[in-house]
Amino acid sequence: MAKIVIIGAGAMGTAFALPCLDNNHDINIVGTHLENDFIEELKNSNNLHPGLNTQIPQEIKIFKFEKFEELLKSNVDLIVLGISSKGIEWVSDQLSKLYKSTKIPKLLMLTKGLSVYNNQYELLVDKLERLLAEREIKKVDISAVGGPCLAT
């Protein structure tokens, strides 16, 4: 059983958690700094996720941002990035603060899209790798999901 932390409590990150649970992994979802109110509403609605119209099983633990550092420092096997494309810089800052002196766990990026860097298109997974390297986090094992995406 792998210990997986998903960053982002939106539809994509939460939808990804369900098959992970089906495969007997230990799943923790931690919201970003922008999702505390959303997570509170989720807990008040008996874990009914409004974006998925699905009841999230109690075995999937959902935390507010205040638990971010604690969860990511707890022998994680895989960090899943279920954040928007606008959050790539933010998450690279957060990860580089936490893993400055230790090896970063494997990353799986659910975020898809392109950005522009030096007047050329750049895949978001390449952007993340570049931003982490600029912050002294090198030799990162990053995988990315491809294809169309609707988390419903």
What is the meaning of each model-derived region?
Residues M1-T54, I60-F65, E70, Y117:
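NAD(P)+-binding Rossmann beta1-loop-alpha1 motif at the extreme N-terminus of oxidoreductases
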